[in-house]
Curated annotation (Swiss-Prot):
It comes from Lactobacillus gasseri (strain ATCC 33323 / DSM 20243 / BCRC 14619 / CIP 102991 / JCM 1131 / KCTC 3163 / NCIMB 11718 / NCTC 13722 / AM63). Belongs to the UPF0473 family. Signal peptide: none annotated. InterPro entries: EF_Hand_1_Ca_BS, UPF0473. This is UPF0473 protein LGAS_0424. The lineage of its organism: Bacteria, Bacillati, Bacillota, Bacilli, Lactobacillales.
Length: 104
């Protein structure tokens, strides 16, 4: 299991998150993007254990990468601003509706 995201390489596509009860869960990275309006980078994740038949709950976080582009779970930040959430949701909707981006 990897605890790092490398935003510059496609082969590091997983991160382990720990919930409030100390339970670890492995997540796959759906995609990352940067918003010039908010001056932040974002990562969208989904549980690695999801099968193709399951509905997927996507989680989004802003993040701070180090100078090598690496990110650990402690570098993820919850999105609390409604306008920021709406922007992230819009990017996700565009991704999901564009077959060229989502790989379908």
């Amino acid at each position: 299991m990897s605890e790092k995201i490398n935003a510059n390489q496609d082969n590091d596509r997983q991160i382990t998150l720990v919930d409030d009860q100390g339970n670890e869960e492995l997540f796959e990275i759906l995609f990352t993007f940067t918003s010039e309006d908010y001056g932040k980078s974002y990562v969208l994740l989904y549980p690695a254990a999801v099968s193709d038949d399951d509905d997927v709950e996507v989680q989004a976080f802003s993040y701070d990468a180090d100078e090598d582009g690496d990110v650990t779970s402690s570098d993820l930040h919850e999105i609390s601003d409604d306008d920021e959430w709406n922007m992230v949701q819009g990017v996700l909707n565009t991704f999901l509706s564009d077959d060229r981006l989502s790989g379908e």
